[in-house]
């Protein structure tokens, strides 16, 4: 299947040159890393990031911090496992798919072999295109990856995993099997957990709640993430993808996590009464 983008022209520009200008702005923005990716690194081990998925004008500079780190730690052929929440309610509880996703920068191929192996080994995972057709949380990550590819930093294939079910046990299962299949197939991989943090709360409230979950992520405490989200009613849309990413990364040997940047939509709109929180976090 060839999937067409559904939020190009809304969350990010649909035209090639306008999108390139926007991506470069995200890197060079005062809220971004303030420099463009310029060199490929040496891949020594898997890398995980937490990355936001709002409109680029709001969260793109935050996301750029994570992709800058990716560029410094990869080379050659890399499979990007991208986990995102299901906002649409379409399709199955946990799903991947095979095929190609179109972007304004060109086509991105799914690692069909990895997706098929993961589907066959992980009982909670379905092959289901419907979950992905109108979901934006994975799509908005692809232009950043394709941009790195166009800079000859790496050659990417990806595996989309859309999570409507985000309970703790299911999320841990997904993470376990990602790591298992990655080891079995000896792939160079990065794992991207797509999530925004608190939604439509005051800057003070959102920052305070988000700090609780960010602390858990930095300490690689997967169960505490789930507990804090539930206990403190934190409206983080992709806690399941984050838990799955951390489980997979720990199984692949990760020991450290660093907060690269935190910001809110209020830092753009200057309206701090109702904001959405965004964080870029590195796990390795």
UniProtKB/Swiss-Prot annotation:
InterPro entries: MEMO1_fam. Gene3D superfamilies: LigB-like. It comes from the Archaea. PANTHER family: PROTEIN MEMO1. Belongs to the MEMO1 family. NCBIfam families: AmmeMemoSam_B, PRK00782.1. This is MEMO1 family protein MmarC5_0191. It comes from Methanococcus maripaludis (strain C5 / ATCC BAA-1333).
């Amino acid at each position: 299947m060839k999937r067409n983008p559904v939020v190009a022209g809304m969350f990010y520009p649909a035209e090639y040159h306008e999108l390139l200008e926007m991506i470069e702005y995200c890197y060079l923005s005062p809220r971004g890393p303030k420099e463009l990716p310029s060199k490929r690194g040496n891949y020594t081990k898997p890398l995980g990031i937490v990355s936001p998925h709002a409109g680029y004008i709001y969260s793109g500079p935050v996301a750029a911090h994570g992709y800058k780190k990716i560029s410094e730690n990869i080379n050659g052929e890399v499979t990007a496992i991208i986990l995102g929440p299901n906002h649409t309610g379409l399709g199955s509880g946990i799903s991947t798919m095979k095929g190609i996703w179109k972007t304004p920068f060109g086509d991105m191929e799914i690692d069909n072999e990895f997706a098929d192996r993961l589907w066959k080994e992980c009982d909670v995972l379905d092959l289901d295109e419907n979950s992905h057709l109108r979901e934006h949380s994975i799509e908005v990550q692809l232009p950043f990856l394709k941009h790195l590819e166009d800079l000859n930093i790496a050659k990417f294939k990806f595996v989309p995993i859309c999570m409507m079910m985000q309970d703790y046990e299911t999320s841990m299962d997904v993470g376990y099997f990602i790591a298992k299949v990655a080891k079995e197939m000896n792939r160079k991989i990065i794992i991207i957990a797509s999530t925004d943090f608190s939604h439509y709360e005051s800057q003070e409230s959102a920052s305070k709640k988000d700090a609780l979950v960010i602390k858990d992520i930095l300490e690689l405490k997967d169960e505490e993430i789930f507990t804090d989200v539930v206990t403190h009613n934190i409206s983080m849309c992709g806690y399941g993808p984050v838990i799955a990413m951390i489980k997979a990364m720990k199984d692949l040997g990760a020991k450290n996590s660093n907060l690269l940047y935190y910001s809110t939509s209020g830092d753009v709109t200057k309206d701090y009464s109702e904001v959405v929180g965004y964080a870029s976090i590195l796990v390795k």
